[in-house]
């Protein structure tokens, strides 16, 4: 063999020995944050079917990402309503149970340290009388007199 004709190593069977391109993950291609490759691996490893199509993990990752974003947005709103900066399991429970569709989807799910929804049966509430209903709830501001020092 001639010294001028060297065999390039590291091409890995690819044509051309130029600089290697940066790998682009399937999550980036699909514009997702959830890991498409890992979900595909779990689908194959779990033996849910003999074969798994190439689009199945992408679709499943998109669905899971949407559900996570929906729950987190509602839980963030619940945390803000309670004047908190951190989402707690209580906020997750309030978010899920106050949303009709998520409540139906997660009907049999128990959230640890979530508590229960605040609910008082109307029968247990004190009855309103007619005189209390007609009277104003708070005195008007015109009747108040300023305090004298």
UniProtKB/Swiss-Prot annotation:
Question: Which Gene Ontology terms cover its molecular function?
Answer: DNA binding; protein heterodimerization activity; structural constituent of chromatin
Segments for region (Disordered) = 1-24, 128-149
Q: Please verify whether the record's keywords include DNA damage.
A: no
Q: Which residues carry this modification: N-acetylmethionine?
A: 1
The protein's matches in InterPro entries, at most eight in alphabetical order, are given as: Histone-fold, Histone_H2A, Histone_H2A/H2B/H3, Histone_H2A_C, Histone_H2A_CS
Q: Where is this motif: SPKK motif?
A: 138-141
> What Pfam families does this protein's entry cite?
Histone, Histone_H2A_C
Q: Where is the composition biased (Basic residues)?
A: 140-149
Gene3D superfamilies the record matches? Histone, subunit A
Q: Which domain of life is it from?
A: Eukaryota
Compartments annotated for it: namely: Nucleus; Chromosome
GO cellular component terms listed in the entry, alphabetical order = nucleosome; nucleus
Which keywords does this chain's UniProt record carry? Acetylation, Chromosome, DNA-binding, Nucleosome core, Nucleus
Family the entry assigns = Belongs to the histone H2A family.
According to the UniProt entry, the note on domains is:
Contains one SPKK motif which may interact with the minor groove of A/T-rich DNA sites. Phosphorylation of this motif may regulate DNA binding. This motif is reiterated in both termini of histone H1 and in the N-terminus of sea urchin histones H2B, but its presence in the C-terminus seems to be unique to plant H2A.
Assembly description: The nucleosome is a histone octamer containing two molecules each of H2A, H2B, H3 and H4 assembled in one H3-H4 heterotetramer and two H2A-H2B heterodimers. The octamer wraps approximately 147 bp of DNA.
Q: What does this protein do?
A: Core component of nucleosome. Nucleosomes wrap and compact DNA into chromatin, limiting DNA accessibility to the cellular machineries which require DNA as a template. Histones thereby play a central role in transcription regulation, DNA repair, DNA replication and chromosomal stability. DNA accessibility is regulated via a complex set of post-translational modifications of histones, also called histone code, and nucleosome remodeling.
Please state what the protein is called: Histone H2A.2
